[in-house]
Design a protein with these regions (language model features):
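Structural alpha/beta surface segment adjacent to cysteine/selenocysteine redox centers
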Residues: 1-80, 113, 139
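C-terminal cap of thioredoxin/glutaredoxin-like
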Residues: 5-17, 76-142
Length: 142
């Protein structure tokens, strides 16, 4: 959630998914690159905790829209704005390491070294891709 390329890709991906909502399923995997993004793990944990209350995507969007403010103050502010149960949110944030670890292990197993990273019907692409690039890949792999 701290990666500027991920933020750019996020906006493009939202457009793509909105256009093809009946044709694609978006699966999100956490891969916080903590050596270069010190808030990445904390943000991932907060998003996962929000997901336990059915608000992952709303929380995810809020994090990217306020990427320059990442930190505990923002995480709680977003949780409040989304009307999350704050006690459950805080409790779930402490349990997330085991939940996010499989995503990290999968990325490492696949040899992923950076984000954003995408797989569409077996085709791999990465970076802050343009909508036209995603459309081209989508039509090729259908």
């Amino acid at each position: 959630f701290q990666c500027p390329y991920c933020a750019a890709a996020h906006d493009t991906l939202k457009q793509f998914v909105a256009k093809h909502q009946d044709e694609v399923t978006l699966v999100y995997k956490h891969y916080p690159l903590t050596p270069i993004h010190p808030e990445a793990m904390s943000a991932a944990k907060a998003a996962w905790a929000a997901g336990q209350q059915g608000k992952f995507w709303e929380y995810h969007d809020a994090l990217f829209s306020q990427q320059d403010k990442l930190g505990d103050t923002l995480y709680l502010e977003i949780a409040r704005n989304l009307n999350l149960d704050l006690e459950k949110f805080e409790r779930d944030r402490t349990l997330t390491t085991n939940a996010i670890a499989p995503d990290i292990q999968l990325a490492e197993k696949l040899g992923i070294s950076g984000t954003p990273f995408f797989v569409m019907n077996g085709e791999i692409f990465s970076g802050a891709v343009q909508l036209s690039d995603i459309e081209e890949i989508f039509h090729r792999v259908q």
